[in-house]
Amino acid sequence: MKEKISPYFGQAFPVPKIHKDTTMKEGERLCKLGVLERQPASEWALPSFIIHKKDKTVHFLSDFWEVNKRLVRTPFPIRKISTVLQEIEGSSYATALDLNMGYHTIRLDPDASKICMVIFPWGEYSYKRLPVGIAGSPDIFQGEMSEQLRELN
């Protein structure tokens, strides 16, 4: 974070009645998975909403624009796919990783969790896991994946 930042407390996006149950259920699902945790009011509050996907599931989105303005990003060099393919050429084995919700495998420290607070008309939640939408999330995730897979090269 940049020095001397001021917290941001935004207004909750309105949720149409037709989508309220679906949105609440997705919030509950993410709480059960340990991604979100219900919290009392805080200095930070970022509006969130869901979008409906073609497969009838929903995707949870948070507006981290105000947080991203206050972040100092530490870029991680993401390797080109052509480099990775050259490295595995001639390998005996290959595999695929299912990284659905991959960012959510990385725990946030308590200070980051306090900033990653989201608000709905019915309450506030804090992210306990790395959310999609934070400017540094791809760098953090790629760094963690590189560390975890380092010995497989």
Features from the language model and the residues they span:
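Retroelement reverse transcriptase polymerase core
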Residues: 1-153
